[in-house]
Design a protein with these regions (language model features):
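Flexible "cap/lid" subdomain of the alpha/beta-hydrolase fold that forms the substrate-access gate
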Residues: 2-36, 40-192
Length: 192
């Protein structure tokens, strides 16, 4: 939550985010890179690997489907019901207003309520997420990831979608936002 928060939607285009990942890899001086990612980071990592922005030794993804599979499943009612929030986040200012009220208290509740084992994710554990969301510009930055995904074309530029590095996908079967059917057919794009 302490990173910069570029204010413009276009700052969250996949090409810019890929450039950020590439800069981190370059700055690390690493000769072999395993890219490990979850949630929004995983969407970026899929795109990074597909477009071969930098060589990777391995890719590890947690609970985000391959982009081609995700696009297919977003056409089903089953996944649309789970992904309603992505469409809500497209609205200007309203998501910030509703989720930012009471010092971003709804964010803490969302983190707790979406946990499978709610008793294992206490208020204290959700507090850093709420506090980060309450910072000036944080909610707009969070929603701009979704806004750029839907409103800029580069996120959909994944060519044939092939991933040419060994890939491990770890999946929690009770994910509240992404249906497990999103994994169907992934082997067509990830041969290893």
């Amino acid at each position: 939550g302490g990173s910069s928060r570029p204010p413009r939607k276009r700052d969250y285009r996949i090409a810019n985010l890929n450039a950020d990942v590439a800069a981190l890899i370059d700055a690390s001086g690493a000769r072999e890179v395993t890219l490990l990612a979850h949630d929004w980071g995983a969407l970026i990592a899929w795109n990074f690997a597909i477009n071969r922005v930098r060589p990777l030794a391995r890719l590890v993804i947690m609970n985000v489907p391959h982009p081609h599979c995700a696009r297919r499943e977003l056409k089903t009612w089953r996944q649309l019901r789970k992904s309603w929030y992505m469409f809500f986040f497209q609205l200007p200012r309203l998501p910030e207003l509703l989720l930012g009220r009471n010092n971003a208290a709804p964010i803490g509740r969302i983190f707790r309520d979406s946990a499978v084992n709610k008793h294992r994710f206490t208020r204290a554990e959700a507090e850093p997420y709420r506090a980060a969301a309450a910072q000036p510009g944080a909610l707009t930055a969070m929603f701009n990831y979704y806004r750029a995904l839907f409103q800029t074309p580069d996120a959909r530029q994944t060519g044939d979608g092939m991933v040419h590095v060994p890939t491990l996908v770890i999946w929690g079967e009770q994910d509240v936002a992404i249906d497990i059917h999103c994994l169907d057919g992934m082997e067509n794009f990830v041969p290893d």
